[in-house]
A protein has these predicted regions:
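Short, well-ordered amphipathic alpha-helices
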Residues: 139-146, 174-183
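Short, solvent-exposed loop/turn and secondary-structure capping segments
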Residues: 98-101, 150-153, 171-172, 184
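Low-complexity, highly charged intrinsically disordered N-terminal segments
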Residues: 8, 15-142, 146-148
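Conserved SF1/SF2 helicase motif Ia
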Residues: 151-156, 177-187
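Non-catalytic protein-protein interaction scaffold segments in large eukaryotic complex-forming proteins
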Residues: 1-9
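Walker A/P-loop
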Residues: 152-175
Length: 187
């Protein structure tokens, strides 16, 4: 199974597995901070120590925010529903993209072909997954999106990768999440 499968993360029946996979991401990130940053001799050099300390503190803060996002998904039913909706929406979008590419080339197909295993056409039902940085970005922004009292509302997080790196999906994921969350919680 893919750890960050949009199909799996979009399944309300797979909450425990989804939470465990998200927690694994933050555990591995925490290990990376410890092993690659804190214990990196270059971070201890006097000419880099202040900058190194600042980088480590920002990484630890991001880790904290990601864990808070997971906690909210785990404990707040509306956050969980919004998270599954986000994944279902992104999965459907990726299915439609694959469908459009093939049908645009004159290949006979139907959208349902892209939402189930179809060995004849070389299609897997579980065809789309988040990259770790995308799901991490979503997790670290959840609290600031849903808690009107959160100090995180004063933070602006931007992604930068060259074209084709996956920024748009991460931003669209957050948009789908907050649309669903607001719909679920509006009076």
């Amino acid at each position: 199974e893919k750890a960050f499968s949009m199909l799996q993360l979009g399944s309300p029946k797979k909450k425990e597995v989804s939470i465990a996979n998200l927690r694994l991401l933050t555990a591995l990130y925490g290990d990376w901070i410890k092993n690659e940053l804190k214990e990196n001799p270059q971070m201890q050099e006097s000419s880099f120590q202040a900058t190194g300390k600042s980088i480590i503190e920002k990484c630890l803060d991001s880790l904290r925010r990601m864990n808070e996002g997971i906690d909210l998904i785990e404990k707040d039913e509306n956050a969980f529903k919004a998270f599954t909706f986000m994944n279902q929406s992104m999965y459907l979008q990726r299915s439609i993209t694959a469908y459009s590419k093939d049908c645009g080339r004159g290949i006979p197909c139907s959208l349902s072909d892209y939402m189930k295993d179809n060995k004849e056409k070389g299609i897997e039902q579980d065809h789309s997954e988040w990259r770790p940085f995308q799901i991490a970005f979503i997790l670290l922004n959840i609290k600031g999106l849903i808690d009107p009292e959160s100090d995180e509302r004063n933070i602006v997080d931007l992604l930068y990768f060259p074209t084709g790196g996956g920024k748009t999906e991460a931003y669209l994921g957050l948009i789908a999440f907050i649309i669903a969350y607001r719909r679920l919680t509006s009076d």
